[in-house]
């Protein structure tokens, strides 16, 4: 059954916003409660004068390497990485894809040819929103660099280690010990990091469509808004650990 059109969207608008404002929104509202390294620009979605959505884009330390694997001649100012997305749960269906389409228009107007992003990482989210919004899929890698504290907060170990906050003797003990040293009691989340690319330039899209992979399906858990919904499908985690944070070690039960 098809859903009715979301009437809220007729009163919405998307505009660039300052990084200071985006950081405040992201660290308060996004499920990770963190600000991404290398953030370069941000966009707000406004409904009746209120900010009900935020997208942050920029350059992580691995952005260039991942882009150049697929587009070797593209220039730095022609690509960017979508790093954070938050949409208020008060907004109706299709709000995220609606905002994403308008952000892509703004990026296109500024000369961006290609956008990349990831799904999964701290959860077994295969990226349904990207699959429904014209993104292309380029596989996944095992991911064990997210740590879930006993308070339910997700922390990125790689970002923390980059600034020399972990003694060498702790580094030798592995991710679990590193997470405990940095953030207290918790568990490593063992999942996958899925790579999606949105080619804005038609020529790049035509070329990359020949290399794209089938979309992954049936995650153990997926994101709906800022909430995580158990799924009755097969778990897609890569070699799950006996204890893996909030991810179930067997297919989740609805």
Per-segment meaning from a language model:
Residues 208-254:
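Short, cationic low-complexity segments
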Residues 26, 40-59:
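Conserved beta-hairpin
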Residues 13-16, 39, 58-186:
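Acyl-donor binding region in acyl/amide transferases
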Residues 40, 191-196:
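Short hydrophobic/aromatic beta-strand or adjacent loop that forms the aromatic wall/cage
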Residues 186, 190-193, 204-207:
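C-terminal accessory module of base-excision DNA glycosylases/AP lyases that mediates lesion recognition
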Residues 197-202:
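Short beta-strand-to-coil "C-cap" segments at the C-terminal boundary of structured domains/repeats
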Residues 8, 20, 51, 74-76, ...:
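A short, polar/charged loop/turn motif at coil->beta-strand junctions and beta-hairpin connectors
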